[in-house]
């Protein structure tokens, strides 16, 4: 039996409110939805009140903040005003320089390209524009800042109503790919793709639109998909392991500034530990791999490694050299066996502070011997 694609949910009340309030502009715009871009199929551009345009929780630019907030404070409901205010704040803090520049551009030149919304008002792109126009309205109340130019995706009863996959592919084409716009951080890009894949969207579908990838049917394309997984998913999986070990699952903001350290652990260490030739040549036993990985995670956890290295990544990159020496490997394994035994401390920040006091000196002493 063929799988039936999951359609996005549409709030019929909000859909009708937008239908009743939209104002024609006589302009047309082509968007990369389904195969419409290649067919140059254009949509009407409308103006609608800015309050009818809503932020999506799936916004890739602030994926780290959303996931962390939901982990620490509970599930967010897209349609609730409190959720919209939280997302507005996250966007305002995401790139203050670009936000400030956009306000100046909108104030001087107005809107150019329209945003894209679902039939009930959720923004696929244009989140930063909504934020900027909302802020402009506070300081410079003006009718031209109270409406957003949009194209509206097919709605209820339309055969081309979006599926969940359609929305993921559209957002991917508009934002995640290199288009000259404000691009996601590597971590937010990883979280966006990873969430889509976990939701059942095929990674090859997401990547085949990327101009940096080759034809989807070629062997080279399959190789590049694997490289993408290694570059984005492997560090994220190590990050998830780190957060779980430290009892702060889902709190991505705690490690947002350590992405490159997880990259180094994946590319410079774990890739070698998964290589049979490397393990045989360096006498690495399979039951040592988990402890070596734990050593890498402990080195990432160090807040101050200045006594032994310029940054944690340098230490991570030394691990393959250290474990190739039987004597030095013993000290690496000792680092991996250092655990957080402060389970009685409930507050994660206090627990981490205590770990830094108790364990970091021990780790630094072992590193100095290497």
Predicted region positions:
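Short, charged/polar connector segments at secondary-structure boundaries
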Residues: 2-141
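Amphipathic, charge-rich alpha-helical segments that serve as recognition/docking helices
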Residues: 90-91, 138, 144-210, 215-237, ...
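Non-catalytic, well-ordered alpha-helical scaffold segments
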Residues: 100, 130, 191, 227, ...
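Amphipathic alpha-helical "recognition" segments
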Residues: 141-148, 187-190, 215-302
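Alpha-helix boundary/N-cap detector
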Residues: 220, 230, 250, 287, ...
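Eukaryote-biased activation of long, low-complexity terminal tails and linkers
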Residues: 287, 291-329
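Charged/polar low-complexity intrinsically disordered segments, enriched in acidic residues
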Residues: 323-370
